[in-house]
């Protein structure tokens, strides 16, 4: 294949599953002979929500929740002909979102 840079972004709420998926992708790419950089941990996005516990009164009693979105970045610098085939045949867990840009 020609010189083509592929960027893979992984997102998920559980950092352990995200790291396992990134390791699985890196191992599959190394088997094909592709040159990669990463996985690079990107900043975690934290969304915080405050909910009033009582239904009618007592604003002083609130409960806080947060959602943490963890992100990883993998760059494929040099690809081979088997690289894209290896990426399409991967089985990733349900809690991981993957974005591939060419």
UniProtKB/Swiss-Prot annotation:
This protein's UniProt keywords: Ribonucleoprotein, Ribosomal protein
Coiled coil: none
Alphabetized SUPFAM superfamilies for the sequence: Ribosomal protein S10
Transmembrane portions of the chain: none
Keyword Ribonucleoprotein: yes
Keyword Plastid listed: no
GO function term, MF aspect, one: structural constituent of ribosome
A Gene Ontology cellular-component term: ribosome
Record's function text: Involved in the binding of tRNA to the ribosomes.
UniProt similarity note: Belongs to the universal ribosomal protein uS10 family.
Subunit field text: Part of the 30S ribosomal subunit.
Name of this chain's protein: Small ribosomal subunit protein uS10
Species this chain originates from: Dehalococcoides mccartyi (strain ATCC BAA-2100 / JCM 16839 / KCTC 5957 / BAV1)
């Amino acid at each position: 294949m020609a010189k083509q840079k592929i960027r893979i972004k992984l997102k998920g709420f559980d950092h352990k599953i995200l790291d396992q998926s990134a390791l699985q992708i890196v191992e599959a790419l190394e088997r094909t002979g592709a040159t990669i950089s990463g996985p690079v941990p990107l900043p975690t996005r934290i969304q915080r929500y405050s909910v009033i516990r009582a239904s009618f009164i007592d604003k002083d009693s609130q409960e806080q929740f947060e959602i943490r979105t963890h992100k990883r970045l993998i760059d494929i610098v040099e690809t081979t002909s088997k690289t894209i085939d290896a990426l399409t045949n991967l089985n990733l867990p349900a809690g991981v979102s993957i974005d591939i840009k060419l």
